A protein has these predicted regions:
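N-terminal (or domain-start) structured segment
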Residues: 22-121, 183-206, 299, 322-327
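Ligand-binding pocket segment of bilobal, Venus flytrap-like solute-binding proteins
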Residues: 158, 162-166, 170-241
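Hinge/capping helix and adjacent helix->loop/strand transition within the periplasmic-binding protein
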Residues: 88-97, 111-195, 256-289
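C-terminal lobe and pocket-closing loops
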Residues: 214-284, 311-314, 319
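Bacterial N-terminal signal peptides that target proteins for export
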Residues: 1-9
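An extracytoplasmic/periplasmic, membrane-proximal ligand-sensing/linker region
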Residues: 36-38, 179-180, 185, 267-327
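C-terminal motif of bacterial Sec signal peptides marking the signal peptidase cleavage site
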Residues: 17-20
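Beta->alpha turn/N-cap motifs
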Residues: 100-106, 129, 192-193, 210-215, ...
Length: 327
């Protein structure tokens, strides 16, 4: 497990440079005329992942339902386990026209590296849902059950497993499952879902953890085999896949899916986004997205979202230290 890769360090240096160049473009706005400008929406990971899918679903609803009256510019600013994208947003201090979605890396990346920011620096809009994961292998492995996987991993001595980000919920899940089952892992991080899946199917990885939305098509096409689902209840689209709880595994975390503004964003902008996102999550399109992607609705606005982040950060840090990912 690489706790601080050269790639992560380089991405953080780039993020710092972007932060230094950024200036607030929201000066002069008031509650009466907000929003009146183009929105700069940052996705901190590459195309095709859970963060990307959620963000683009939100943007599509905002546009279709005419909830945001100006243009929305969406940019994938991936790199450094989210450090590049959220570092960019951090540099938009006070700007009500910059926004981003969150994932587990929003909490874990600052725990691992000197990003210059933490979740506490940003203006919270809300937690909208939590996301569980699927543990999958290549069908060519001939492994069709969780017990077969555990036996294989123990025989091999150490297995190569992959996920999104260096130290994130994906790593935590891999580490907790391996420790509780009694096998060893070599964790390989990726910034993009496509690269992760390609590495599994090419034989470079023994297994991956991914969100259901990202692998459901591959699973249904029999191009991957799901061995375990980390949610407490069976996945509706894959009812035959056992849950971690049913196999005796406890305490596995979920991915927080939320929305944030830059540090010191105006209170009127925070209020506007809370009110607007309440409309977004009430739409049939959002409810369909939640159901299709096997998300768990968990809605907390403003300060309640901050309280959730505080507890989750404490839990993640404890787990990462237990598994040797943090010193």
């Amino acid at each position: 497990m690489r706790t601080f890769t050269k790639a992560l360090a380089a991405a953080i240096m780039v993020a710092a440079a972007l932060t230094a160049c950024n200036t607030s473009s929201g000066a002069g706005d008031s509650a009466e005329d907000y929003p009146s400008k183009e929105l700069d929406w940052t996705i901190a990971f590459g195309p095709g992942g859970g963060n990307d899918i959620m963000a683009r679903t939100m943007v599509d609803i905002l546009k279709k339902d005419k909830l945001y009256p100006r243009d929305i510019r969406v940019e994938n600013r991936e790199g450094g386990s989210g450090a590049t994208g959220w570092g960019y947003l951090f540099g938009k201090n006070g700007d009500p026209y910059a926004i981003s979605t969150t994932s587990g890396s929003f909490i874990t990346t600052p725990l691992e590296a000197k990003t210059g920011w933490t979740y506490q620096d940003f203006t919270p809009v809300g937690l909208l849902a939590t996301d569980n994961a699927v543990f999958a292998v290549d069908p060519k492995s001939k492994i069709t059950s969780w017990q077969q996987w555990v036996d294989h991993a123990k025989r091999k001595g150490k297995v190569a497993v992959g996920g999104i980000s260096t130290v994130n919920v994906d790593f935590i899940l891999h580490a907790m499952l391996a420790r509780q089952a009694g096998y060893e892992i070599d964790y390989v991080p990726f910034n993009e879902e496509g690269q992760l899946q390609t590495s599994l199917l090419s034989g470079a990885l023994d297994a991956i953890i991914s969100n259901p939305a990202e692998v459901l098509g591959q699973l249904q096409a029999k191009k991957m085999t799901a061995l375990l689902y980390t949610g407490n209840k069976p996945l509706a689209a894959l009812p035959e896949v056992p849950t971690a709880v049913s196999l005796g595994y406890q305490g596995l975390p979920s991915m927080p899916r939320g929305l944030i503004l830059p540090p010191k964003a105006p209170e009127f902008a925070q209020r506007w986004w809370i009110d607007t996102m309440k409309k977004v999550i009430a739409t049939p399109q959002w409810k369909s997205y939640v159901e299709k992607n096997a998300l768990t609705e968990d809605v907390r606005w403003g300060a309640d979202f901050t309280t959730y982040l505080q507890k989750t950060s404490t839990d993640f840090e404890r787990i990462l230290r237990q598994h040797g990912a943090l010193k």
